[in-house]
Amino acid sequence: MKPAWLVLRDGRTFRGKALGAVGEASGEVIFHTAMQGYQEILTDPSYRGQIVAMTYPMIGNYGVNDEDVESRRPWVNGFIVKEASPVASNFRSGASLDAYLARHGIVGIQDIDTRALTRHLRDRGAQDGIISSLAADPAPLLERARALPGLVGRDLVAEVTAAAPYTWAEGGWELSRGYVATPPARFKVVAYDCGIKYNILRQLRTIGCDVTVVPASTTTAQVLEAKPDGVFISNGPGDPEGVPYLIESVRGLLGRVPTFGICLGHQILGLAAGGRTYKLPFGHHGANHPVKDVATGKVEITAQNHGFAVDPASVSAHGWEPTHLNLNDGTCEGLRHREWPVFSVQYHPEASPGPHDANYLFHRFADLMSQKGG
């Protein structure tokens, strides 16, 4: 195996071995605490601009397959593991993790102390870095890492959104039955693609939505022209303030159409409501984050992937209230308007990977559309 380096902008350096494609990759280095679901993570467009380090010590045990992807290709800038399993022990596997990364040009590194890296990022915060399996000397990489642009203010959504509208018809997938039939469509939904995951679209179809996916640049007028029963605003990468055109479009829809936002969509709704967002020290990236429903007191274990959060106090004067709180750090995990049929969550109720505790939120969206006559 070729040697490889990981160099962070604060000078911390790790020597390891090459994984996947040979080359260099740069981006914001973050850690993810899920034990499985690496294929879904790799193909989640929300990771555009980031190098993902998995905290679980062995990754790749079950290989990769065609069904578990969350988009048309991997989107991570780079991938870090302690050990990549050379054996894929799974009858569904079509390739090893290493081969999959190499085929898609994803540069990775393995055989580094991911515990030390995780503690460093926890204490110092997520930061830009470079993986290189080309450099013999890591010293020149440090200056380049310090010159990286970071995520704040950048429009990464434009890099992952759909080029044109399309209709989604595929239902869920089950091990025993494969792709399952979907119910007749009851609602017409326009889904803003900020980096939307396939399993979100499957969940929308499962509750009876005829889903039209539109680019993030779609205007308010274009959405209203479609006469939807509901609007969905998806997950996506980076800083929500980097997409002012989408914020403006969503602002024009508030109170006019039942609306549901997830992850970046939650942040976009917060900004459209006149609120503010801020960057978290190292973000929430994992499949076991406890979230409390303020109204019921019930605790949900949730899948999360975000580096920014909404300040709930900044929207409270505009008719909004927090609905969910993160029990680890107290950050806002959900919002709803007191009068309009609009709500959002910061986490991922569709899971993939992760628990299904919050799947009921899709049915809540269907209920709002039903009440509006959908």
Enumerate the language-model features and the residues they cover:
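Active-site glycine-centered loops adjacent to acidic/histidine catalytic or metal-binding residues
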Residues: 113, 263, 306, 348
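A glycine-centered loop/beta-turn motif at secondary-structure junctions
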Residues: 334-371
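Active-site-proximal beta-strand elements of phosphoester/diester hydrolases
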Residues: 188-192, 302-303, 343-347
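Proline-centered loop/turn at the N-terminus of a beta-strand
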Residues: 107, 188, 258-260, 276, ...
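Short clusters of small/polar residues that mark proteolytic maturation junctions
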Residues: 18-19, 56, 282, 304, ...
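Cysteine-nucleophile active-site neighborhood
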Residues: 229-230, 234-301, 309, 354-369
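Catalytic beta-strand/loop cores that center a nucleophilic Ser/Cys/Thr
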Residues: 297-340
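RNA-binding accessory domains that recognize and position tRNA/RNA substrates
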Residues: 1-221, 225-226, 240, 352-354, ...
